[in-house]
Every structure is written in C-alpha cells, then in structure tokens.
C-alpha cells in the first residue's frame, strides 16, 4: 500500500475542520502540512493513520510505504537518475498529451522549494545528467538542485511509472478514469527498462447526484459513517 503523501496540497477539502490551517499551507507536501484535526504531526500522517486503521480493521495483509519517506531515504534515487537519463524520451511520451502552453513549461521533475518547502511546478531550463541535477526558473531566480533524496518529486504519471520500476510492480488496479494515464505510464516504465504491470480498471463510485466522488471536494462517505448504518461485511462487498 503506497501513500502519495509527498503530493502538494492543491486545494482545501470541503469536509475538513480548521480550514485556515490548510489554506496557509497550500502546495506544501501533505507531510509538511499541519494536521487540521490536531491529532497527528501532519495532515499526511493523519491520512496515513486513517488508511492503516481501515486496512487493519478489515484484516488486509499489506506493507505500507510512504512517498515522503521513500523519496527522502533515497530509495528512489537510482530510478530518479534513470528518469533524468531518459528525460527527452519521457517528454516525447508526455508532451503530445498536453496543451501548447503547458508543453512550454512541463518537466517530469517538481522541485521542493528550499525556502518555502512548497512543491514547485516551474520550468526546468537545464538538466545535468552526469551530476544528477536540474536548473529551474522560479520567478526571476535560476536555482540548481539535486533530484535525489527528496529534493524533487516527479509529476504523477512519471512518478507512477518510476514506482512500478523501482518496486518491480507486476499488477496495478486503477479507476477507469485513469486508463489513458496508465497507458502513458506503461510506456514510460518500458523506457526505464522494465515491463509494465498488468492492469485492472474498475468502475467509478458516484455520489447521490451521479457525480464522481472527489477527495479534494470531500463529497464521499467515511468508513466510520458507513459502519454506523451497515455491517463490516457489507463494506467488504466493495
């Protein structure tokens, strides 16, 4: 079980208390955002604990991995350097799927700002493959950074492929809205030098309005709410 807890907080969910805490920390990795529930060290850790509680209650056999820890401990370093080595080939896969303006600024690498701690989506103006570094433009500053040890993270489609490569993933499930993304990530995994995993696409869960349940909107139902009205066995059906 892998938690994308190094993703930047893009928006404030509607069903979260103390929203001002999150509003002050937008674009920071979830593990760098204070917990609005004031129970854990970070919002990311709160979400991780909720996930592990669910898995434990339903007796899943799992190994938990945190994106933040995996990046910062250097467990992705080899794969990240390979992404840098194959930078041009990966962009050849991604860029045709983007609009013209986005193509001008896209890079697989998202630097972590050394001053604010935010995940930056900024133009990369030079790559240094032998040194394992990139130079990016942040406002009027040109900043050089290593790509390893948690100083950068990857855009999610490249991150997905890199993770498959690093962990030798051979089976992956995803919602049907991610089928096209899985195809792209499979191509990138093959560029990195490994066979992409077998995939299984499942149907989407919809709310009472027939709309997709969104984590950012918070328009779903929690496990605790479900179990107030139904048995654990009923949830196991899903």
Question: Where is each model-derived feature located?
Answer:
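Alpha-helical recognition segments enriched in aromatics with Gly/Pro capping
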Residues: 86-92, 96-238
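N-terminal Rossmann-like or analogous alpha/beta NTP/dinucleotide-binding catalytic cores
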Residues: 1-91, 185
């Amino acid at each position: 079980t892998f938690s994308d807890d190094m993703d930047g907080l893009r928006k404030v969910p509607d069903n979260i208390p103390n929203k001002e805490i999150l509003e002050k920390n937008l674009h920071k990795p979830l593990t760098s955002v204070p917990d609005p529930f004031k129970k854990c060290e970070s919002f990311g850790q709160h979400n991780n604990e909720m996930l592990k509680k669910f898995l434990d209650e339903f007796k899943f056999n799992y190994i938990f991995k945190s994106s933040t820890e995996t990046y910062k401990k250097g467990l992705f370093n080899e794969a990240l350097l390979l992404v840098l080595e194959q930078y041009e080939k990966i962009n050849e896969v991604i860029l045709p799927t983007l609009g013209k303006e986005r193509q001008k600024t896209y890079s697989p690498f998202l630097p972590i700002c050394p001053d604010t701690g935010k995940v930056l989506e900024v133009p990369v103006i030079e790559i240094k493959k032998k040194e394992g570094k990139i130079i990016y433009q942040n406002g009027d500053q040109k900043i050089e950074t290593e790509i390893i040890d948690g100083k950068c993270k990857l855009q999610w489609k490249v991150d997905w492929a890199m993770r498959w490569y690093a962990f030798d993933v051979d089976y992956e499930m995803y919602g049907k809205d991610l089928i096209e993304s899985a195809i792209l990530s499979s191509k990138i995994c093959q560029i990195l030098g490994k066979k992409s995993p077998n995939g299984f696409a499942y149907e989407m869960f919809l709310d009472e309005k027939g709309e997709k349940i969104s984590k950012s909107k918070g328009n779903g139902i929690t496990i605790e709410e479900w179990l107030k009205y139904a048995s654990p066995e009923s949830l196991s059906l899903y």
